[in-house]
């Protein structure tokens, strides 16, 4: 008799194929779920494999449009970044995948969900916190945290032996000495040889982005139009055909930015980051589209965003949003509160940025706006007396100097010399 139906996040790889068979051995019915978030994947082959192993159903949900509109573009608006360089490609995909998995679990009458995340990574937290927010009564079956599973499958050999026993087809390719996770925003590489932070990644590891040294000698120019902080149009000249190409749909804009950046060596990083579970981890990332869109967006904000709004956003909204996304706290009251602050900061971010991509570099060529009036070249010009007179600054400095003078007097009274 079945113990009930479980919705398993299935990748088609060795780990989740073994988990699928193991769940069947435990007496569960299993719905194999996959989310299409733009990764390179043979979904038909994954379906065939899951059903052959014994899944009662295979469901693949196309999340690409929702991923861009609901997650990736708001991340561009808020300039999301973790520890200065990581643009959160993996973290940003988790809420959309988790929601799709819970939706499938509900549709298929599953009492539980399951995944193949390890017990030392961030993803187990990101997925499960999302699951519990979206369906508070759901049960999570987490094999890699269950002694009866991880003690039985202590290494890859145990997984391969079990796969052979169950007739699970395993690709006869040499396992690469690192693990990967891919979506349309980026791909990550970690573990294996990368666990030594001083090991230089081999050239053949990088899958998506051309080596900057091998990138074209001819630069690629493009323009990106923003409305209320959202990229709404991307235009470029195809260097091979000399034809102008313009795209406006959110997914098309994102993919065009991705393809152009990848071809020109833009978006590779290699970092050591702090995981939510208080471990340091080395990761290599290819984050082409977010690198281009974020840099263009930051540049346009310099022209169109109020100074005080920008400082408040940068000091509070951006770091907290980025931290919450990294930690898997998307479906929480605090993240809902933070997300509500993004759009009000972006209402004036309207204009066009001209960008050049060249051998790994994103070069801003210029920016303009037809609607916003914060920038007036005559006000800051050295050649014109407009806005305010030079003598007006005397009073401004005098007011600003009041507390500075008191600070200097205090130091003098205490016999403390101000030093560099």
Swiss-Prot record:
Listed Gene3D superfamilies: Argininosuccinate synthetase, chain A, domain 2, HUPs
Give, as one word, the top-level EC class.
Answer: ligase
Q: What is its main location?
A: cytoplasm
What does the record give as the reaction this protein catalyses?
Answer: L-citrulline + L-aspartate + ATP = 2-(N(omega)-L-arginino)succinate + AMP + diphosphate + H(+)
The cross-references to CDD domains, in alphabetical order and at most eight, read: ASS
Residues binding L-aspartate: 118, 122-123
Disulphide linkage map = none
- According to the lineage, what is the superkingdom? Eukaryota
Keywords for the protein's UniProt record, in alphabetical order: Amino-acid biosynthesis, Arginine biosynthesis, ATP-binding, Cytoplasm, Ligase, Nucleotide-binding
Q: Does the keyword Cytoplasm apply?
A: yes
Functional pH dependence:
Optimum pH is 7.5-8.0 for the forward reaction and 6.0-6.5 for the reverse reaction.
Cite the GO molecular-function annotations of the record: argininosuccinate synthase activity; ATP binding
Check the record and name the SUPFAM superfamilies matching this protein: Adenine nucleotide alpha hydrolases-like (SSF52402), Argininosuccinate synthetase, C-terminal domain (SSF69864)
Q: What EC number(s) are associated with this protein in UniProt?
A: 6.3.4.5
Entry coiled-coil feature ranges? none
Q: Does the keyword DNA-binding apply?
A: no
What does the entry list as the binding residues for ATP? 9-17, 35, 114-122
> Where is the secretion signal located?
none
GO BP: any one term: argininosuccinate metabolic process
Q: Which InterPro entries match?
A: Arginosuc_syn_C, Arginosuc_syn_N, Arginosuc_synth, Arginosuc_synth_CS, Arginosuc_synth_type_1_subfam, AS_cat/multimer_dom_body, Rossmann-like_a/b/a_fold
Miscellaneous field = Present with 1870 molecules/cell in log phase SD medium.
Subunit record text: Homotetramer.
Matching PANTHER family, A to Z?
ARGININOSUCCINATE SYNTHASE
Name listed for the protein in its UniProt record: Argininosuccinate synthase
Q: What is the lineage of its organism?
A: Eukaryota, Fungi, Dikarya, Ascomycota, Saccharomycotina
